Amino acid sequence: MRLVGFAPDPPPHPHFHLPPYPLPPSKKPSHQLNVPSGDFKTAGFNLTSNTILSVTGTIWSVQSLDNWPKVAALPSYDSPGAMPGARYQALVWFINATNITVSGSGVINGAGSWWYTKMTNNARPHIMEIHNCTDVQVTGVTLQNSAFWTLRPIYSRNVWIHDMKILAPWPGTGEPMGVLNSDGIDVDSSQDVMIERNYISCGDDHVTVLAGAAEAGRAFNMPTRNVTVQDNILGTGMGLSVGSSVSGGVQDVVFQRNTMSEDVWAWGAGAHVKTRIEYGGFIRNIAYLDNIFKQVSTAGLWIETGYQSSGNCTAETCTEIRDIVFRNFTVLDATSGPGSILCYAERPCVNITLENVHMSSSTDPTRGWGGCEHVASGTFIDVTPAGLQQMCGL
């Protein structure tokens, strides 16, 4: 798989660039595993380099803890909420590999509802983990009913996820039992990642961009950079996020031309930039461009520096947040209001831009922004509801 550049529109600010497009593997794979029509049960298994996994039937996770392999803790995580200690291997696991394609019209089912009855901590397995790999393509398949985050590239480079489906039940569905933290795609300490033309319906963030947690993440020091998330259709879920685990740093991320559809009830924020007290790291050069969210039940746009945490931070443990752009950003029905920008007093946000940002609410058309705190600089052009710039003191 190689990368080819392209000429984007003018960048949203001087230091921003769009990632290049990855192309299919240029080296012919030497192995192919075909899953024909029918149902096939398995515990977690590995894919090695130069392999195609072609799925026509359905791969099911076996419902047995005894037969499921465990793998070591992740070196960039050490907090209680971020998978400490041994964890269960992903159903489909690629590790230390290159030139892998997963394709086909079939289904990979993680039996998430069963797993959630056995354990509620974050040792539950992903459906697919791309771990320290290069040149990986996932296309066509449906990943369904994950026990935890559905698809996770971590410590990887040159990953292309396109034209596939993720169907993970959110906790209110009831059939099957919803699974908390059933994110769609989590890009973690990885570079050169393209996520495009997918349908994602899940029980947490549709797509989020991460880079390790707390002291372990800062010490591991592997940023996520050069990520594009574009032309996706989003069903139920919690929107397009950066964070909250960004201790290794996140930069150069574009979310563009994505649509949260109106035919399902959506919950959570549309765009959510979130950090935790004492995690540190940085979030730089993030752009939300030409996105439409047809219904969100909380904030349409939310920068939140105290996500699930409280207290004070230091210069090292306050996350740096700068150069965040929301342009041509529309929320047709933000039922709980347009949102807020709440930054650290100890380390204010720098260069926040909102341009052609419009939100409305069917439940309270007069409701304004929730607040704006500690924004050192920014630009606000054609924003409704009005009043955000004044709240920010700019």
Predicted features and spans:
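Extracellular/periplasmic carbohydrate-active domains that bind, remodel
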Residues: 1-394
